[in-house]
């Protein structure tokens, strides 16, 4: 498998391939990362790894997102591995997602506004805290390893994933309806949703209201079919629970929360 060493950005969130991640970068250790990434030619990938935190605390104070919930740039200059224990890799889930920063804009106060998109899953092999920011050696994690090992088995897995994808989309529409208290005509239509099973699996995993450990479990599923199968069970369970709860605000698949870091 292909390995690489990339900057590491820990979060109390899970990034999935194909999903957009807005970031407000305040801490010096992550500002240093963005300054270096910003020197990369805009036509070249500006890659870093987003990994969910298992233990320790997030790379920044997150609070409520109000102005005083984040530090003033330059006043929170912690060491790269500070807050993550003597062996930082133990604080992180071992499967993360490579992000490609399409936009890196430095503000007048030295903080950064970043817009990145998840690309591929990777497995953490090691973490280095000796530089100005964390880096990790990672290896690519194939989405459907069976397809690489055996053509016939891979085709069978793809057919299973396609069938599961249809069921997941139906269950997701029902989940949307219950979650939003919406009418059928206000739901996202099939034309608005992708037909690629792996894309469906990541979109649903990102959009569903689930905790970080559950989202992490979906990210590191061994293949698309396994992820879709688990999502189908989760959606059915969550929809049944929501039936007994008051209406909740509609979820918006086109927006993602901005993570202050």
Model-derived regions, located:
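N-terminal low-complexity, acidic/polar interaction/targeting segments
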Residues: 1-261
